[in-house]
Regions:
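Cofactor-pocket helix-loop regions in the catalytic cores of large enzyme subunits
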Residues: 1-4, 8-13, 155-189
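Glycine-rich phosphate-binding loops that contact phosphosugars or nucleotide phosphates
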Residues: 4-159
């Protein structure tokens, strides 16, 4: 059957991407979408509704709460014979060979590479782009956007790489200047 509802399960930075993703999915496709913190989902799951797509979002593919919540959702839905309640899952991750990759058949591999810093900048942005693409695809399938509007949305995505390159280049120059200016300073308040 057709997807009538979307549940997104995530933790941390992935949950923030999921919150933006839920907005995009609802705005573009018109499908009601809810975001759940994975640990809360496990202990207070929403009522089972038919034709629900569950999306698990985890940068590493190993986030324990997200994996446990997805596993619980698979078991809950598999215990019902009505096909409208069957598990319908997608995972968005940076590691398709991870635990979530083995757990979920449909994987969106964000291909962001290794995240060096603590702040998940590359993976966060890649998750946002994944949600944007998913929202466009659902809008196309549902017919909620005209072909012209879909084309405009895709063209806006195509414009992003050179804009980001310019932004990073400007940021690198200002960062280098700040580092040079503060290099010999011992204390900062």
């Amino acid at each position: 059957g057709s997807i009538e509802r979307i549940e997104i399960i995530a933790c941390g930075t992935s949950k923030h991407a999921a919150m933006v993703g839920s907005f995009l999915l609802e705005q573009f496709s018109g499908i009601p979408t809810n975001v759940f913190y994975a640990s809360e989902f496990r202990y207070s799951p929403p009522p089972l509704l038919p034709n629900t797509l569950t999306i698990g979002v985890t940068q590493s593919g190993e986030t324990a709460d997200t994996i446990a919540a997805i596993d619980m959702e698979i078991k809950r839905r598999s215990s019902i014979e009505d096909k409208k309640f069957k598990p319908n899952l997608i995972a968005i991750t940076n590691r398709k060979e991870s635990s979530i990759g083995r757990q979920v058949l449909n994987i969106i591999d964000i291909c962001a590479g290794i995240e060096v810093g603590v702040a998940a900048t590359k993976t966060f942005f890649a998750q946002l782009l994944s949600f944007y693409g998913l929202a466009i695809k659902f809008a196309q399938i549902k017919g909620n956007q005209s072909p012209d509007e879909i084309g405009k949305l895709i063209n806006e995505l195509i414009k992003l790489p050179p804009l980001l390159e310019d932004l990073l280049e400007k940021h690198n120059k200002s960062s280098e200047k700040l580092a040079h200016d503060f290099f010999n300073i011992k204390d900062v308040i």
